[in-house]
C-alpha cells in the first residue's frame, strides 16, 4: 500500500467496487462516518428508480452522472469515498451489452490518471444476497467478481480486497485507507 504524498496531490478518492450486493454501500457509509468524510452514492440508483428497463445509452448516462457527481464532491473535499465508479459501470456495460465502449474506457483511464489519486476497495460477494428492485441476478456474483481483479490489474490500479463480516471489512478498509494516507 503505497502512501499518498499529501504535499503533491489534490486529495484522495477511494472507490468501493465489486459485484452487486457485495457490501459497497454499507462500506462506503461506514468509511465516510469513520473518517468524517463525504461519500458519493451510486448514481444508478436514482437514475433507474421506478424504471423497469434500461439500454446502453442509459448506462453511459449513468457513467457520466456518476463521474460528475463524484467530481463535484471531490472538488470541495480532501478525502472522498465513492460507492461505485466507472470500474463497476464498465464491467456492467461490457457484460450487459457484450463489448467495450470507447468513451467509457477513455473516461475510466482519465479518472485513474488524474492529478487526484484514486485507490480501490474491492468487495467480495461473500455476504448474503438481499433482493431489491434494481438488482438483477443473485447467481452471477462470483463470475462478476472474477472480472474485477484482472481489470484493476490491467489498469494498474492500487486496490485492497475486503471480505468477511462488516467489522472485518471495515477494519481491513480503514487500515488500507490509513496506509494510503500515511497515517
Predicted regions and their residues:
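Pre-Walker A adenine-sensing motif
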Residues: 1-7
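Hydrophobic anchor at the beta1->P-loop junction of P-loop NTPases
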Residues: 16
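Conserved nucleotide-sensing/catalytic segment adjacent to the nucleotide-binding pocket
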Residues: 53-101
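The conserved Walker
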Residues: 20
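Conserved lysine of the Walker
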Residues: 24
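A glycine- and Lys/Arg-enriched "phosphate-lid" helix/loop adjacent to the NTP-binding pocket
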Residues: 97-168, 172-175, 181
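Pre-Walker A (Motif I) flank of P-loop NTPase domains
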Residues: 9-13
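Conserved substrate/cofactor phosphate-moiety recognition/catalytic segment
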Residues: 29-71
Amino acid at each position: 500500500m503505497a502512501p499518498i504524498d499529501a504535499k503533491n496531490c489534490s486529495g484522495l478518492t477511494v472507490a468501493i467496487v465489486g459485484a452487486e450486493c457485495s457490501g459497497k454501500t454499507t462500506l462506503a457509509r461506514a468509511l465516510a462516518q469513520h473518517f468524517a468524510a463525504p461519500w458519493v452514492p451510486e448514481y444508478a440508483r436514482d437514475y433507474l428508480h421506478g424504471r423497469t428497463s434500461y439500454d446502453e445509452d442509459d448506462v453511459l448516462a449513468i457513467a457520466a452522472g456518476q463521474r460528475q457527481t463524484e467530481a463535484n464532491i471531490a472538488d470541495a473535499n480532501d478525502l472522498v469515498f465513492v460507492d461505485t465508479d466507472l470500474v463497476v459501470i464498465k464491467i456492467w456495460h461490457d457484460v450487459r451489452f457484450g463489448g467495450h465502449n470507447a468513451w467509457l474506457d477513455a473516461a475510466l483511464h482519465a479518472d485513474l490518471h488524474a492529478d487526484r489519486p484514486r485507490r480501490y476497495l474491492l468487495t467480495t460477494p461473500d455476504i448474503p444476497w438481499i433482493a431489491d428492485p434494481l438488482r438483477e441476478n443473485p447467481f452471477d456474483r462470483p463470475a462478476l467478481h472474477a472480472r474485477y481483479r484482472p481489470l484493476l490489474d490491467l489498469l494498474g490500479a492500487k486496490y485492497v480486497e475486503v471480505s468477511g463480516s462488516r467489522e472485518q471489512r471495515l477494519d481491513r478498509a480503514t487500515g488500507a485507507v490509513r496506509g494510503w494516507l500515511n497515517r
